[in-house]
């Protein structure tokens, strides 16, 4: 992979508790761990003032492949942004091949919850839990590469001695809509009955236009 890459960005609004809503935006980035001392951040464009500002990210965790996940949360989301990584006297960028990444500010302000999403991988698990009835529920984001697609998980509760597939259903599309330089993101929801008190692992796969893409959490699989 490149020295730095966006994983995902999201923005929306949440209730303030006083009858109004507060804006939020979250950014998740993966970098090659080229040295201990490094600076990772988001350059965001303010649609109101037309200015660009730098927002540093914080280290989140290490993952296989000598990679690290960094993230940051802001209030008002930028309408455009790039990712910068400074290390060993070098500066690396992920600026969407020079076109910048875009978020839909109107959709963010008008949505209770997440209203606008950008993802860089073709498929990415974002939330999962086992509910009280023993159902594994997984939320997955995919790039809308083509209309016909299949989103699913493969899971096990016995350390891969046996495994099963569970297929997802389309839930919603996020703004901004697809453009020549940034495909739109869709949310798919997957449910599987694993049993009350069960633990295990899963990975996500996305089949579209004759190709299958995987998210296996950098080779670790996801645990539940």
Residue spans for each PLM region:
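Glycan-association/targeting regions that enable binding to alpha-glucans and other polysaccharides
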Residues: 1-224
């Amino acid at each position: 992979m490149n020295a730095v890459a966006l994983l995902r960005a999201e923005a929306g609004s949440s209730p303030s508790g006083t009858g109004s809503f507060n804006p939020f935006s979250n950014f998740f980035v993966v970098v090659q761990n080229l040295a201990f001392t490094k600076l990772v951040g988001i350059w965001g464009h303010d649609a109101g003032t037309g200015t660009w500002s730098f927002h540093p990210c914080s280290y989140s965790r290490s993952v296989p492949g000598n990679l690290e996940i960094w993230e940051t949360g802001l209030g008002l989301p930028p309408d455009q942004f790039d990712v910068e990584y400074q290390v060993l006297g070098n500066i690396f960028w992920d600026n969407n091949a020079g076109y910048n990444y875009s978020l839909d500010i109107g959709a963010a302000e008008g949505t209770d919850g997440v209203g606008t999403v950008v993802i860089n991988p073709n498929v990415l698990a974002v939330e999962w839990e086992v509910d009280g009835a023993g159902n594994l529920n997984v939320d997955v984001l995919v790039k809308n590469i083509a209309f016909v697609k299949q989103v699913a998980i493969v899971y096990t509760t016995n350390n891969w001695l046996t495994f099963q597939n569970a297929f997802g259903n389309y839930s919603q599309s996020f703004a901004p809509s697809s453009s020549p330089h940034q495909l739109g993101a869709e949310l798919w929801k997957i449910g599987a009955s694993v049993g009350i008190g069960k633990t295990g692992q899963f990975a996500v796969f996305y089949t579209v236009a004759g190709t299958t893409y995987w998210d296996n959490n950098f080779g670790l699989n996801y645990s539940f």
